[in-house]
Design a protein with these regions (language model features):
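Single conserved hydrophobic/aromatic residue that forms the stacking wall/gate
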Residues: 1-13
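A generic fold-level signal
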Residues: 2, 23, 40, 52-53
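Single, functionally critical "micro-switch" positions that shape active/binding sites
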Residues: 3, 31, 38, 43, ...
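Short N-terminal edge-element motif at the start of the domain
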Residues: 12, 18-19
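Conserved kinase catalytic-core helix
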Residues: 19-40
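C-terminal catalytic region of ATP-dependent kinase domains
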Residues: 20, 36, 52-155
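Hydrophobic residue at the +6 position relative to the catalytic HRD Asp in the kinase catalytic loop
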Residues: 45-47
Length: 155
């Protein structure tokens, strides 16, 4: 298994010419942990290729499963958000967001900082008036909770 993974990494690097995969994955894991995106998997980790065959890392995409957004089945509105936050499981390398983020940061360093403030969050959430007030408040509380948990990610 380790040999197979090492070989896959060598093939990937030689095909794309990109050699900062660890940092890229670490950024994805940071975003996923912070926003509680439980649906990161190998089909939404990608690279882009232009018409000349040059590759670059893909912008982060497919975060629709974040912020306890499945309110019909997994994370009902009437349940305690702090309890649900503690129960969210990642689907990428480990089921534990903190465990996979710790491993990635230990291997590749912390290479992502967030620059937004609680006021920024409040302003954005309050302006999202297409959503009901209780959903907006829930998102705000989730993000505030994550900001407190991951203080080291903010400048």
């Amino acid at each position: 298994e380790p040999y197979r993974r090492q070989r896959q990494m060598c093939i990937r690097d030689s095909i794309t010419g990109l050699n900062n995969w660890g940092e890229y994955i670490c950024r994805l894991f940071t975003i996923d942990a912070f926003f509680l995106n439980e649906d990161r998997h190998m089909h939404n980790i990608a690279v882009l290729m232009n018409g000349k065959g040059d590759y670059k890392y893909c912008p982060v995409f497919d975060n629709g499963a974040g912020l306890l957004s499945d309110t019909t089945m997994d994370y009902p509105m009437e349940q305690d958000i702090y309890q649900m936050i503690s129960e969210v499981k990642s689907k990428s390398v480990s089921q534990n967001f903190d465990e996979q983020l710790d491993v990635a940061e230990n291997l590749y360093g912390q290479n992502l900082q967030f620059l937004f403030t609680k006021k920024n969050v409040s302003d954005i959430v309050n302006n999202a008036d297409t959503y009901p007030p209780e959903e907006r408040k829930r998102v705000e509380l989730i993000i505030y909770s994550q900001m407190n948990k991951y203080k080291y990610l903010f400048r």
